[in-house]
Amino acid sequence: MLVCIPEVLPKSEVAEFRRLMDAADWEDGRSTAGAQSAMVKRNEQLPPDSDLARALGRRIVSALTGNPKFVSAAVPLQIFPPLFNRYAASGGHHFGIHVDNAVRGDHLTGLRIRTDLSVTLFLAEPDEYDGGELVIEDTYGSHEVKLAAGDAVLYPSTSLHMVTPVTRGARVASFFWLQSMIRDAQARSMIYDLDNAIQALVERLGRDDPETVKLTGIYHNLIRYWAEV
């Protein structure tokens, strides 16, 4: 399940992020890559332990946990501290096909998560750079994602994916992973579809409609059945 989430951050906040990031020191992005990923990763990254990366990351997590679409699709249990990368044409940056590590650990907080879902939050407008598409492969083929600044995409961490070479400008983004309360991707997808159907019925029939109440009960009972907390 691939879900695009618009306007996670307003344009004004994106501009503030970019101003702070443009003034920061960047390092080789391979510092946080696994052995296989490091072979195909060419980009820059804000030092993950820097005060700036941590502060901006907390703002992103706060925005996402208050976003109903994100919460519905992810059913998040633990969110890894967001990281930040930059793909510049001048550096020939790209990230070849790879799969994310199954487990991520943060040595500052001691947090360890199973990576169920991956998130990319775009911080550069599509017309700022050429190339740099996030290409995600699943059983239905390849999907190219290049969203407006402030928008995010959520997809299974089991997916093979890549970032195509940037040939003009620079692609700036935040990326991170999360552990869902619902481990099984198919179950999580059904929960998301059910929640969307319930919200549509609420709009048409009202929250107090008996059938809407019954479906809401089924939704919560399925969460209770599948959740690992």
Curated annotation (Swiss-Prot):
GO terms for biological process: DNA damage response; intracellular iron ion homeostasis. It comes from the Bacteria. Fe cation binds at H98, D100, H161. Binds 1 Fe(2+) ion per subunit. One of its GO terms (molecular function) is L-ascorbic acid binding. It holds the Pfam family PKHD_C. Its cofactor is Fe(2+); L-ascorbate. Keywords: Dioxygenase, Iron, Metal-binding, Oxidoreductase, Vitamin C. Residues 78-180 form the Fe2OG dioxygenase domain. Its EC number is 1.14.11.-. 2-oxoglutarate binds at R171. The keyword Lipoprotein does not apply. InterPro entries: Oxoglu/Fe-dep_dioxygenase_dom (IPR005123), PKHD_C (IPR041097), PKHD_hydroxylase (IPR023550), Pro_4_hyd_alph (IPR006620), Pro_4_hyd_alph_FE2OG_OXY (IPR044862). SMART domains: P4Hc. The keyword Metal-binding applies. This is PKHD-type hydroxylase RPA3479. It comes from Rhodopseudomonas palustris (strain ATCC BAA-98 / CGA009). The lineage of its organism: Bacteria, Pseudomonadati, Pseudomonadota, Alphaproteobacteria, Hyphomicrobiales.
